[in-house]
Amino acid sequence: MFRGLIYFINMSLSPNWKALQASTPGGGAKGQPGDAKRNRAKAWRAKKSENKKVVGQLDPGLSKAKNVAKSKVIKCQALQIPLRARVHKNDPTRPTLGAILQSDDAGLEEALHAPPQPIEPVLARWKCAPGKFIALDCEFVGVGPNGARSILARVSIVNYYGHVLMDEYVKPIERVTDWRTWVSGVTPAMVANGISFSEAQERVKRLLNGRTLIGHALINDLAVLGLDHPRADIRDTQKPQYFKTVCGCKTPSLKHVMKECVDLNIQQGEHSSVIDAQAAMLLFRCYKKEF
């Protein structure tokens, strides 16, 4: 009896169900059993063809790792991701980061191509204000066994136009066991007359308040400063997928990103936290859509 009732209900509803299927996009009859398999095969052949095109553009003289990175760039360019602010390679007469950043957004690419000025022009007063965006970079020295742990030795902050808002050496709060001068550029004499850690922390905190923070691998700088910042207000130049693809690694260095994306060389010797902060700001301004 129940089987007959179920059969009767199915028979009475089937015309309505078919009408609903016909009126709904994609609601018609399912494809043939072999359709999914054929579609997968078609997609595989298309991908294989694309890979062959990429391989044809690789240089057999390069190492496997470099060719892998190059293939990623080729595929990225095939997706029409623009390489903004590209400039001529190996040009010894290049403007400084400070001079480039003084330009407005519309003239930024032109500034990258411009010859260096003997004297950098004086910034307008409104370009010297903190503004909405600031870039931060710190230099560390090592403490503890083998200098493995980092503490703050220098902190620099620049605004949207590269103007230095803060650049201070900081007295170490612990005994330094490794000055890391070869990379940090910091010596005992430099920090002897530096400000206290608490003063540096408070000044940075005031500048961060209500602003968007730019920097490279900022988790390290904020940790050493003992500060945090809302994630929504952070633009870390190590994070964009485009930079990772162009550099061919998951955690590209600031030096690597600068060379690959704006063709500028930084950190040729000892680091400068001012230059590194300006470099991060330049990357942000050239590639805003990637953040």
Curated annotation (Swiss-Prot):
EC class name: hydrolase
Signal sequence bounds: none
InterPro entries associated with the record: Exonuclease_RNaseT/DNA_pol3, REX4_DEDDh_dom, REXO1/3/4-like, RNaseH-like_sf, RNaseH_sf
GO molecular function annotation: 3'-5' exonuclease activity; exonuclease activity; nucleic acid binding
Keywords for this protein: Exonuclease, Hydrolase, Nuclease, Nucleus, rRNA processing
Alphabetical GO biological process terms: RNA processing; rRNA processing
E.C. number(s) listed in UniProt: 3.1.-.-
Sequence ranges assigned to domain Exonuclease in this UniProt record: 133-284
Subcellular location: Nucleus
Disulfide bonds: none
Keyword Heme in record: no
Gene Ontology terms: cellular component: nucleus
Keyword Magnesium: no
Role, per record: Exoribonuclease involved in ribosome biosynthesis. Involved in the processing of ITS1, the internal transcribed spacer localized between the 18S and 5.8S rRNAs.
UniProt family annotation: Belongs to the REXO4 family.
Name listed for the protein in its UniProt record: RNA exonuclease 4
Organism, as annotated: Yarrowia lipolytica (strain CLIB 122 / E 150) (Yeast)
